[in-house]
Design a protein with these regions (language model features):
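Membrane-interface helix-boundary motifs at transmembrane edges
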Residues: 3, 87-94, 138-143
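Basic, gly/Ser/Thr/Pro-rich low-complexity segments located predominantly at protein N termini
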Residues: 111-114, 125-128, 132-135
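Membrane-embedded alpha-helical segments of multi-pass membrane proteins
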Residues: 73, 77, 121-130
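N-terminal TM1-TM2 helical hairpin plus the immediately adjacent luminal interfacial "cap"
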Residues: 14-98, 103-118
Length: 143
């Protein structure tokens, strides 16, 4: 089957699953604010769990107590686009590449991040962008 015969949503399936988890965690977090403590705490043993959990947590409230939509929205749109591109161009390697980008950003953040609690999937978004850009140059793929 040719890639052009498959609908675009087939490539968006796994990114949408990841985002659905993020949005469910975010909705839960709007009720229980202390959930974001499971982010990455650089160079602290208690922060190691954040290497796995931090991409799923996004800020839920602004300082005035109102709901903060910006963090999760600003991660969701680029993740959907870049994640779908990863599936499209690297269908057989998608999970392997995503795993290493996911773990790599968490380890990098734990090793070199500021001494604060870090949450959100921005690191994965930047890693996806970097990977797709650099691999495009290496492969000389104009798409």
């Amino acid at each position: 089957m040719n890639k052009k015969n498959i609908g675009i949503w087939v490539y968006a399936f796994w990114p949408l699953i990841f985002l659905a988890i993020c949005w469910c965690v975010w909705l839960y977090g709007t009720q229980f604010e202390n959930i974001v403590k499971l982010g990455v705490h650089p160079r602290e043993i208690k922060g190691l769990i954040g290497i796995i959990t931090h991409p799923f947590f996004h800020s839920t409230h602004k300082l005035d107590g109102s709901i903060d939509w910006s963090h999760i929205l600003n991660n969701s749109v680029p993740f959907l686009l870049l994640g779908s591109a990863l599936v499209y161009y690297y269908k057989d390697l998608t999970f392997k590449i995503f795993f290493w980008l996911f773990i790599g950003t968490g380890i990098w953040l734990w090793s070199f991040g500021r001494s604060e609690n870090h949450i959100g999937s921005s690191g994965i978004v930047y890693a996806l962008f970097g990977f797709l850009t650099i691999s495009g140059f290496i492969k000389k793929n104009r798409n």
